[in-house]
Amino acid sequence: MWRLPGVRAALRGVRTAVERRSRTEAASETSVGAMERAVVRCVPSEPKLSLSFALADGSHKNMQRDQSEPLGRALSRIATNALKGHAKVAAAKKSRKNRPNAGSGVACAGPGPEPAAACEPVVKLYYREEAVAEDVLNVDAWQDGAVLQIGDVKYKVERNPPAFTELQLPRYIMAGFPVCPKLGVEFGDPTGSLFRWYKETKPRAAEPEGGGPSSSSPSSPSPGWTETGVDERVYTPSNADIGLRLKLHCTPGNGQRFGPSRELESVCPVEAGPGTCTFDHRHLYTKKVTDDALIRTVSYNILADTYAQTEFSRTVLYPYCAPYALELDYRQNLIQKELTGYNADLICLQEVDRCVFTDSLMPALEAFGLEGVFRIKQHEGLATFYRKSKFSLLSQHDIAFHEALQSDPLHKELLEKLALYPSAQERVLQRSSVVQVSVLQSTKDSSKKICVANTHLYWHPKGGYIRLIQMAVALAHIRHVSCDLYPGIPVIFCGDFNSTPSTGMYHFVINGSIAEDHEDWTSNGEEERCNMSLSHFFKLKSACGEPAYTNYVGGFHGCLDYIFIDLHALEVEQVIPLPSHEEVTTHQALPSVSHPSDHIALVCDLKWK
């Protein structure tokens, strides 16, 4: 929930005032013969422009015209369409006039004289009260604020107003779980748009068995809707909403102007949640946002949809998980609720699909005061979110390991060592892993800055030496950022390191060095041996210690995820307890209907020293 009620109330007041003013102006304009809308979409990268408007007969016209076409041709086409619309109206009137009287059964009088053929209406385009010449090209003629006149009807031209290019509600909507529409806005942005949520006044009658007609048939009256009182992009249904469908009324905007509003209704009604989730008990420790002296940090591999929705995942990796619980729409409900319930200041996520970041995580977490940045890897990527009231983003320094190793002089010595082992070098350079590095500055004390790193190292069980090389590149790069670019700033390094505490990678991070004879240098056999000694100057600690596991699937469980912190500048205030073993294994393993990933989030409160 919001922890800034004053700000939220002020924002709601602004939105309400804008909506009220828009409705008042619309009513005022209507009373004096307000102009209809003619919406023009014209972008330089496309050869055609689109023109959309409603004719007097109620039909809606969508036209595509070449931008390089003279205006006169477009106006002529509009006149033809208007004439056809007029003819349809006349034909409908004639048909009604000749229809037998339903009450007496007596036919109406004869048709009488035929009406005169309708003439093509005069169509003109005006700009600043002057007619636009018909030889002007469409691209130049259709300006914002121009007036299109079709016969006696005038239309105000709106060129490139904000518009939704995509608008969709999730399939699964559950009580107690945030609902965030998937949307795309052209010539605008979600933050400048208006939203209002409604719910049905009563549930729809269920469709009878056998597929017979139900209360939702076309002949049935439309369902009644009640305002929920929520005017944000994200809505969290309550238990009182179970069985009711939701409706969202939204108006695209950019902070200065608004486009045509749209409405969408949920396909399915709100369902009951899955019961107790693995994170519910953890939320008891994170009910409030921490004070300025603390940094609540989360690291979490949320399981990319690109991996969850494969036949291999369903039949081999997670055969114990109900298929619907692997679907993205379902898992997003749980992920959003889990993350928002931590009230975190920093969230580092791995295995984030691009669409999940833009359409789900960004809007949902933004509503709770967080801003985020994304780094794509290949099929998925990394996301780092920070609380806007505590931090601002100063700079980003993301790298791909294989690119940095080959091109950055910082890693010249390491590359020379690796070049002595061609087979190992080839394998290392084939990997697409990245590290996301963000420098944040405290909004309360500008002298306090922090380097936040986030990564997902190579996954293969026999890739120990590859992870060692990747970690050496990461730590050298982080040192450059935290010592050379921003001297002396502390480091928080989160991620899925795919390494248990017994591995060389973990030993290297915690102890600051690794010997050339460590067994991980031959993790994939003698052919890929690459013995070398490595060291780094950081003093790092695992903030959450060494849990028994952070990854729990049918065939494996172990600790793979860590939040490494700079011992010189940070200390641990508290670690949020992980779910109990009973909670994790309630449905055999992870993921499950009550847990959205095969990993468990690490959550801790850090304190500046």
Swiss-Prot record:
Function of the protein: Enzyme that cleaves 2',5'-phosphodiester bond linking adenosines of the 5'-triphosphorylated oligoadenylates, triphosphorylated oligoadenylates referred as 2-5A modulates the 2-5A system. Degrades triphosphorylated 2-5A to produce AMP and ATP. Also cleaves 3',5'-phosphodiester bond of oligoadenylates. Plays a role as a negative regulator of the 2-5A system that is one of the major pathways for antiviral and antitumor functions induced by interferons (IFNs). Suppression of this enzyme increases cellular 2-5A levels and decreases viral replication in cultured small-airway epithelial cells.
Disordered: annotated span: 203-231
Enzyme class: hydrolase
Organism phylogeny: Eukaryota, Metazoa, Chordata, Craniata, Vertebrata
Molecular function terms, GO-annotated: 3'-5'-RNA exonuclease activity; metal ion binding; poly(A)-specific ribonuclease activity
Residues bound to Mg(2+) 2: 496, 498
GO process annotations (BP): antiviral innate immune response; cellular response to dsRNA; cellular response to interferon-alpha; cellular response to type II interferon; mitochondrial mRNA catabolic process; mRNA processing; nuclear-transcribed mRNA catabolic process, deadenylation-dependent decay; positive regulation of viral genome replication
Name of the featured protein: 2',5'-phosphodiesterase 12
